Amino acid sequence: MRNILFVAFVFALSFSGRVCAGNPVYSDKSLRNDAEKLLMEWVDTLLTYQCEGLHPALDGGFLCPACARIHGRIGDTVLPLMYLADKTGDDKYLLAAKKLMKWMENVHRPDGSWMNDVHVSDWSGTTVFAAIALYEAVHYHGHLLDDSTCNHWKKQLLEAGEFMMKNPQMYSRRMQGNMKRLNNVNYSASVTYALQALGEMFNRPDFKEEARIVASDLKKFFTVNDFFLYGEGPKIWTPTKNGCLPVDLGYNIEESLPNLAYYALMVNDRELLSIVERSMNTHLEFMLPDGAWDNSWGTRSFKWTYWGGRTSDGFMGGYYAMAEQHPAYLEAIRRNIRLLKKSTNNGLLHAGRDYQASGIPACIHHTFGHAKALTAFLELPPVKAPQYKSLPRDNAYGVKYFQDIRTWLVAEGSWRSTCTGFDAEYKVKGTHPMGGAVSLLWHEQAGPVFAATTNRYALIEAPNMQSNSRKYIMSGTPRVEMVQYGTIYSNLDDLDTDIVYTQEKDKHRFHINTHLVDADQQTPVQGAFPVTLDYVYSKQGMSIVVDYCPLTACLVLPVIAAPSEVVDITSKGMLLQKKEGVLEIICVNGMLKVAPTDEDGRIFNPVPGFSFVPLQIFPEGENKKIQIEITYN
C-alpha cells in the first residue's frame, strides 16, 4: 500500500504542467475533518449494536435493526475500528475490532473464504472485500495488535489469498474449465488490488502474477467511446443492437475503479492508470451538483441509494488517490460527504432521503460499508490542489450524449435530467428503465423531481435489499402505462425504442417512438401499441407530450415529495410547496388523477429511497393527446 503513496506522488508530478504557477493551492484539512467527524458518528453508533453477553454465536457481531440479523460482511468494519483506535487512542475501538473478528469465525470457511451471510447466503465471492478491509487494518494499524491476534489475522489473510487464487470462476476475466459465464466485473477489478497487496505482504509472486493477468485482461473491458467499465451483467461478448454492454455506475465508482486505481498505483502500470483515469472522468459526469450519483440507468440500479450503493464501498479512496492532478475529484468527495451527512439519522446512514419519514428503519450495511470507504481515503496522506474545480454537471452545457450506454444528460438553466435508451439487461428482467425513459429530473432549488426505480420492485439480491413493508408500491419512473388482467405494460421495458435528439434554438427535444410491453417483451392481447412521446427542455422547465395514448393507458408521473411537503392537486395540475419555491405540474391536455397511496398520501419505493405522489394523466377527447408542463418558481 505504501507504493500507492509514492507512485501517486510521481503521477501527480507528471501532470503538474496542467496547473498554472499562479493558481492558489490549499490543504484539504477541512474535508478530512468533516470525514472524520462523520466516521466517528457512524462507528460510535454501530458500537451500540454490537452484541455482548447474549450468546457465543452472537457476541461481537453487529445486529442490524432493519434486517433483524447480523450481516456477514460486517467484518469490513474492522478497518474503521482500527483506524479510530489508532487515531484516538481509545481502547474501545481496538476491543470492538477484536470481538468483531472473533464473531467473523461464524462466516469463515475451511477453504479460507468468508461467506456473505450466516445461513442466508453462502456466496463467498465477497471474500475479496473482506480481505481488502482486513489487509488495510493490519497494514496500517497492525502495531496495535498483540502477536497472537496479528498472526491469526495474517493467517486468515493468507488463506483468503489462496482461496482467490483457486476460484477463477469468481474473479478471472477468462473463461476456463467448466465456467458458464464470467462473474460480475467488480470482483475481478477488486481482486487485482487484493492479490497484489497480499502478494507483497506474504512475498507471494504467484499472487502478484495473477493480479497482473487479471488487470491485463480488464483493459479490454472498457467501452470504446466513453471508457465505461463493463461486465455488470452476463451478456458481455456481444453488444445489444444499440451498441450497449452491461454497465453499472454504482459498482464501477464505488468498488471497481477505486480498486483498479490502487492496483495500478502499486505496480506503476501507467497504461491501466490512464484508462482508469479516463473512466473516472466519464463517471464523474454523472454526479449531480448536490453530490448524488446518478445511477438511474445502470444494470444494477436495484441497489441505487441516490448517494451511492446499498452494499458497495464508496468512491472516495480511489478518487482521492488521484485528486492532486484532478481537483474536481476533491470537490466530488466533499459534496458526497455532505450528502452522506444529510442522509444520516440517529447515527446511521439511510438508503434514501425518505426512509425515516416513511417509517422504514435503516440497514446498517450502508453505514459500515461507507465507513470503510471514508477510512480508505483518510488513510492516504493529504493532497494539495487548486482551490476549487467545479463538477461537470454544475455547468449548463445543454446536452451530452454517451453513446456506449445510449444515454443523454441534459443541463439547461437550473434543470438537470437524464434520458435513457440503455438496453443492456441484467440477469433478471424488469430492472433498470429503458424505452426512452426520463430516468432523472433534478432542479437546483427543488432537488430531485423524478428518480427512476426498478421497473418492478423485487428482492433481486434478497440478503442485500429491504422488502417493502407498506401497502402500496409502484415504479418511480415516468412512463406510459397500461394494466391489463393484472399485467403492467409500459415503455420502460421496451427493447425496440427509437430516440432522436434535436436542438431547437434554446430548447432540447427528444422524440421517442416506443411500445407498451411487459418485462418479457410481451404485448397486450390486442397486439403491439406504438407510443410517441416528446420531451422538450428549456431554462423554464420541461414538457412531456404523448401524441396518442391508447385504450386505458395513461401517463404516470411519480413526483418526488417528502411526506411533510404540502401538495395541492386538481384535475388540471399539482402544486408542490418547496422551501424556496413551488414546483408546478400543469395539464395542458389531459385529466389528472392520483393513484392509491398510503395514509401519508405517498408511495415509497426503497430504491432509491424517495416518497412520491403518483400522478396519472389520462387523455381527454378523441385525439387521445396528453401534454404536461413542469416548472419551478
Predicted segments with their positions:
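Bacterial Sec-dependent N-terminal signal peptides
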Residues: M1-G22
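Solvent-exposed beta-hairpin/edge-strand motifs
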Residues: A561-V588
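Extracellular polysaccharide-recognition and catalytic grooves
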Residues: A68-G72, I132, E136, L158-Y397
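Catalytic and substrate-binding regions of extracellular carbohydrate-active enzymes
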Residues: A362, K372-T552
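Well-ordered mid-protein domain cores that form the structural environment of catalytic cofactors
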Residues: V120-Y171
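Low-complexity, Ser/Thr/Pro/Gly-enriched N-terminal "stalk/linker" regions
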Residues: G22-D76, Y83-S113, L158, E162-M165
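Surface-exposed beta-strand/loop patches in extracellular or lumenal glycoproteins
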Residues: L551-E565
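Beta-strand-rich recognition/accessory modules
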Residues: V19, N589-N633
